[in-house]
Amino acid sequence: VVNTYFLDTSALVKRYVPETGSNWIQSITDVAANNDLTISQITWVELHSALSRRQREGTMSAGELDIILQKFRNEFETKYRIIEVDQALIESAGQLVVQYRLRAYDAVQLASGLYVKTLLMSVPETRLIFVSADNRLLDIAQSEGIAFDNPNNYP
């Protein structure tokens, strides 16, 4: 069975910045683990925002920010399968906002995960795991029939 991990930004940031769950994220994203790694195109913006906030707050230097963003840039299209944010995905996210009262970017992340779920339905021996550090988003993913995991459960 091949695991396909869909990582939202709250999970993926742990690959680039040490925090609770970083070791687990490193293990599932390691090349040797042979997992498929999928992210939403919107993660590009969200990760830049999260890391820039750390620099503004003084927990990361400008030099560290540059190094981490360069690593992410290098991995963005080589390490991850990118789910494009197109009109159909935006419409799906809009429906999720209304249905679950989600924030806009959370809805785009969930819509991206649901899109991956539909793609994998026809692929035998694959398992989708939606990974987020947001418990509410994970509860909603579960209600949509997606297996999930939270990196914060692996301190």
Regions found by a protein language model. Name each.
Residues V1-T43, R54-I67, I146-P155:
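Short, well-structured N-terminal submotif of metal-dependent ribonuclease cores
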Residues V2-T4, V116-P155:
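Acidic, PIN/NYN-like endoribonuclease modules and their adjacent C-terminal/linker elements
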Residues N23, S49, E91, L138-D139:
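Alpha-helical elements of the RecA-like P-loop NTPase motor core of helicases
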Residues I39-V45, Y105-V108:
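Aromatic- and histidine-enriched alpha-helix N-cap/loop-to-helix transition segments
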Residues H48, S52, G94-V97:
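Amphipathic alpha-helical segments within well-ordered protein domains
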Residues S49-R56, L114-T118:
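Short glycine/serine- and small hydrophobic-enriched flexible loop segments
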Residues R53-A88:
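Helix-adjacent hinge/juxtasegments
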Residues T78-R136:
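Active-site neighborhoods of divalent-metal-dependent phosphate/nucleic-acid chemistry enzymes
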